[in-house]
């Protein structure tokens, strides 16, 4: 039963969990002058929305197939499988465009600093760009290996 709702639960768990953790972690960072409260709210709300939209999209596609009981969209029947892959590629292209062409690496690195349990010195825009590039390469490779 939980697999039927995996995508929506994942979106809320990751999105709201990160929002709560980031809000808690932000206090000392605000006191140090590294962030303002409006910045924190904007970054965390953006992360919440950017987590919920893909998860909600996959969940809605999953719900259109009456017999789809699991979240593994590479195993879904067509047309749900093709729609999910199309959405995945769209979200990847959106992320890549934002990070590489629209200077999204800086706000993303600031958001990751709020929600990650890592020293802020390890998170910077260059490393975010590298991570996104690696993620995209491995994501595309996994689609190819699984027989997109």
Predicted segments, located by residue:
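Membrane-interface interhelical loops and short amphipathic "cap" helices
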Residues: 1-3, 32-35, 65-77, 111-116, ...
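Short alpha-helical packing/oligomerization segments
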Residues: 2-8, 12, 70-111
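N-terminal signal-anchor/start-transfer transmembrane helix
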Residues: 2-31
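Membrane-helix interface motif
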Residues: 22-27, 56-73, 102-109, 147-148
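Membrane-interfacial, low-structure loops and terminal tails that flank and connect transmembrane helices
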Residues: 28-41, 107-122
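Long, highly hydrophobic alpha-helical transmembrane signal-anchor segments
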Residues: 38-84
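Loop-to-transmembrane boundary segments
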Residues: 39-50, 118-137
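Juxtamembrane boundary at the C-terminal end of a transmembrane helix
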Residues: 138-148
């Amino acid at each position: 039963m939980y697999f039927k709702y995996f995508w929506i639960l994942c979106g809320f768990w990751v999105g709201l969990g990160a929002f709560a953790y980031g809000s808690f972690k932000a206090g000392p960072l605000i006191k140090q002058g590294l962030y303002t409260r409006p910045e924190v709210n904007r970054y965390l709300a953006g992360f919440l929305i950017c987590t919920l939209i893909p998860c909600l999209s996959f969940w809605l596609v999953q719900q259109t197939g009456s017999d789809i009981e699991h979240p593994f969209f590479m195993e879904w029947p067509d047309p749900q499988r093709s729609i999910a892959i199309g959405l995945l590629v769209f979200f990847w292209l959106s992320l890549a465009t934002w990070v590489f062409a629209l200077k999204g690496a800086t706000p993303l690195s600031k958001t990751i600093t709020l929600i990650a349990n890592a020293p802020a010195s390890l998170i910077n825009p260059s490393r975010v760009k590298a991570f996104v590039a690696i993620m995209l390469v491995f994501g595309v490779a996994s689609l190819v290996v699984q027989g997109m």
